[in-house]
């Protein structure tokens, strides 16, 4: 109620409450409405010469003179400016604070607000416990409890399984919950709430009502799913529109894979993201890094003379993905690193998962390898499921669409197309290694049988057998050899000039043989020593016993006549050393070689003719060359 409406002068205030002034002045307790100070406009009382107030009763007599008890003396021009004075200056000598003794007692016994130590909060956060659980434990066992007791209570409570009940009613998650320790008595607790504020234990506030814990409410790890390696810088910068490092994007990405049940999700970010952000690299929601710290791996970084030195975190990402056989979540193609290591290139081609954000929601594609590739479920699993009915490209190897082809190519490993540069490099390497084909082709296509040709034709063997049965036994002369021998002579010339000579050491009528012995005595003795134990029993014609002396009934023509009864090759004939025939064979092979080189590659012709040194038949050599080309292509 206004003081002028009540018809009396304004009061000199010592407190904002009327009841407080009543308790201070015992005179007001007996006459609470009568004592007033006279104002200028309505003189109920007047001031004396020395500034003492005269208290006028209801009948008009002066009750008392002097300052009322509990009130400070005021001058004539020092009325309260709040009521009737136009002066804005308040009373300098008048205290506006409450002098209620009960108020003073309540302020002295107010509860003390104490916060937990930073190391306790950091210790609990790294273990995965929320600040709500830590506040509840410290309110229960006391803020001064030992770390072991705090950990024991946290273990009993368990890890957070879902969203806290009071998370939607809170406002900020930047500071831990204050812990209240009170030593107030029961009398102070029953005092009026208007005299002192009572602070109670409050819960931890969240940055937004939709914020949840770093671990989803339903997390069931699936061992059949691959581990996930997240390029944290790429994800956070894309969520921040490539302007700021948004930690909220990291949390959305982490929750997506944890809800799917991936057993291990690792996020790589540089170490300096934990520090105070600079103006050139802003960070939003930096407190989220503490919430998801269990899944974060900080790559090294340091400051050298005010300059920030950051290690290449992409190498850590690719190396970890190789060790854990994990999927890489990034929109970076790592071209600089795939050129260094072929294994990293294969990882990027086969296990790189791209993504985007749609209204702050992490969203990878359903077909990471293209429209006709595996689905996201098969892509993220350890055992990929291949589509049962893929559409095969009708052009097959002749397809010119390359990577843009929408159909399936079974000849391309893992659906990857070999570029033109890689194909040319591969063909160039094949041409360089073609010099080694000669020896390989020689080993592959040489005759399976021994290089020894037939020593005697069938007709010669038959004639010799008949003559040996008809001849009577005669004592052997001292000039005869102890037994019959067969000798293989090789000329010191090209392989196709090798020939076989059968020599029968017996009586003198074998004139060509004796002449050959006289011409090549040293070679004869050497071959006799080498082949004495090997060749006598090859064909069963000459037995182990020493044969009797034979008269020569085998004609020269019969002995040296060519025969194709077994092998069917005219060059495998029995004959003496003939230099003219060797020259003719070399000429024939040279002519065949010239014509074959006009048809086939020179390397294949050389290798096949070297593997078959006695072959001069052109159709047979052509067949062998074609077979060699087919084997080489396989």
Curated annotation (Swiss-Prot):
It comes from the Eukaryota. Pfam families: Regnase_1_C, RNase_Zc3h12a, UBA_6. GO terms for cellular component: cytoplasmic ribonucleoprotein granule; nucleus. Mg(2+) binds at residue 314. It is an enzyme of class 3 (hydrolase). Changing residue 313 to A: Loss of ribonuclease activity. Its EC number is 3.1.-.-. A zinc finger (C3H1-type) spans 387-412. Residues 182-194, 201-217 have a biased composition (Low complexity). Its main location: cytoplasm. Expressed in the intestinal cells adjacent to the pharynx. Disruption phenotype: Viable, but exhibit slower development and have reduced body fat. RNAi-mediated knockdown results in increased sensitivity and reduced survival in response to lower temperatures. RNAi-mediated knockdown results in increased expression of the transcription factor ets-4 in the nuclei of intestinal cells, which may further result in changes in the expression of genes involved in lipid metabolism. RNAi-mediated knockdown also causes a defect in the clearance of apoptotic cell corpses in hermaphrodite gonads. Residues 97-106 have a biased composition (Basic and acidic residues). Residues 1-33, 90-113, 156-223 are annotated as: Disordered. The keyword Zinc-finger applies. The keyword Endoplasmic reticulum does not apply. Its cofactor is Mg(2+). Keywords: Cytoplasm, Endonuclease, Hydrolase, Magnesium, Metal-binding, Nuclease, RNA-binding, Zinc, Zinc-finger. It is found in: Cytoplasm. Endonuclease which binds to the 3'UTR of target mRNAs and induces degradation of the transcript. Acts together with rle-1 to repress the expression of the transcription factor ets-4 by binding to the conserved ADE (alternate decay element) and RCE (REGE-1 cleavage element) stem loop structure in its 3'UTR, which controls the expression of genes in the IIS and TORC1 pathways, including those involved in lipid metabolism and autophagosome formation. May play a role in the clearance of apoptotic cell corpses. PANTHER family: ENDORIBONUCLEASE REGE-1-RELATED (PTHR12876:SF37), N4BP1-RELATED (PTHR12876). Belongs to the ZC3H12 family. This is Endoribonuclease rege-1.
């Amino acid at each position: 109620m206004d003081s002028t409406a009540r018809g009396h002068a304004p009061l000199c205030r010592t407190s904002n409450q009327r009841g407080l002034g009543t308790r201070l002045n015992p005179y007001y307790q007996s006459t609470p409405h009568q004592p007033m100070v006279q104002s200028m406009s309505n003189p109920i009382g007047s001031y004396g010469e020395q500034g003492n107030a005269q208290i006028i009763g209801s009948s008009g007599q002066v009750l008392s003179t002097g300052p009322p008890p509990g009130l400070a003396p005021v001058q004539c021009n020092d009325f309260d400016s709040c009521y009737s004075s136009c002066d804005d200056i308040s009373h300098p000598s008048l205290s506006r604070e409450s002098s209620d003794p009960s108020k003073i007692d309540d302020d002295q016994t107010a509860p003390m607000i104490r916060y937990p130590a930073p190391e306790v909060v950091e210790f609990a956060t790294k273990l995965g416990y929320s600040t709500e659980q830590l506040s509840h434990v410290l309110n229960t066992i006391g803020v001064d409890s030992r770390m072991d007791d705090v950990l024991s209570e946290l273990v009993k409570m368990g890890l957070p399984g879902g969203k806290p009940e009071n998370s939607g009613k809170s406002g900020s998650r930047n500071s831990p919950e204050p812990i209240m320790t009170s030593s107030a008595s029961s009398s102070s607790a029953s005092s009026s709430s208007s005299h002192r504020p009572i602070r109670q234990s409050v819960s931890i506030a969240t940055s937004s009502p939709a914020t949840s814990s770093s671990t989803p409410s339903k997390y069931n790890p699936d061992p059949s799913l691959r581990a996930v390696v997240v390029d944290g810088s790429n994800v956070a910068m894309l969520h921040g529109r490539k302007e700021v490092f948004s930690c909220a994007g990291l949390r959305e990405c982490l929750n997506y894979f944890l809800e799917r049940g991936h057993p291990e999700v690792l996020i790589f970010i540089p170490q300096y993201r934990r520090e105070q952000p600079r103006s050139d690299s802003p960070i939003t929601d930096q407190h989220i890094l503490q919430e998801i710290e269990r899944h974060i791996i900080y790559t090294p970084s340091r400051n050298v003379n005010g300059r920030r030195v950051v290690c290449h975190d992409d190498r850590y990402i690719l190396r970890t993905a190789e060790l854990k056989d994990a999927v890489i979540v990034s929109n970076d193609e790592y071209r600089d690193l795939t050129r260094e290591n072929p294994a990293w290139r294969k990882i990027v081609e086969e296990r790189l998962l791209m993504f985007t954000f749609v209204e702050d929601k992490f969203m990878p594609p359903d077909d990471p390898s293209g429209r006709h590739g595996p689905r996201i479920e098969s892509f993220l699993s350890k055992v990929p499921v291949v589509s049962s009915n893929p559409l095969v490209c009708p052009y097959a190897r002749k397809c010119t669409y390359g990577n843009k082809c929408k159909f399936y190519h079974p000849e391309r490993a893992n659906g990857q197309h070999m570029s033109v540069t890689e194909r040319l490099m591969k063909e160039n390497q094949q041409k360089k290694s073609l010099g080694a084909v000669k020896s390989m082709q020689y080993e592959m296509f040489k005759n399976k049988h021994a290089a020894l040709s037939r020593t005697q034709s069938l007709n010669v063997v038959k004639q010799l057998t008949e003559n040996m049965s008809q001849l009577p036994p005669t004592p052997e002369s001292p000039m005869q050899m102890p037994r019959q021998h067969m000798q293989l002579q090789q000329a010191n010339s090209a392989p196709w000039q090798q020939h076989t000579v059968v020599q029968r050491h017996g009586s003198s009528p074998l004139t060509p043989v004796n002449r050959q012995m006289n011409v090549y005595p040293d070679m004869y003795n050497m071959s006799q020593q080498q082949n004495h134990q090997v060749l006598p029993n090859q064909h069963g014609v000459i037995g182990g016993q020493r044969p009797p002396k034979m008269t020569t009934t085998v004609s020269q023509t019969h002995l040296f006549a060519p025969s194709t009864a077994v092998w069917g090759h005219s060059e495998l004939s029995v004959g003496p050393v003939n230099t003219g025939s060797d020259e003719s064979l070399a000429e024939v092979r040279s002519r065949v070689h010239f014509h074959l080189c006009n048809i086939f590659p020179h390397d294949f012709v050389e290798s096949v003719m070297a593997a078959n040194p006695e072959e001069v038949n052109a159709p047979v050599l052509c067949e062998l060359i074609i077979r060699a080309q087919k084997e080489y292509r396989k």
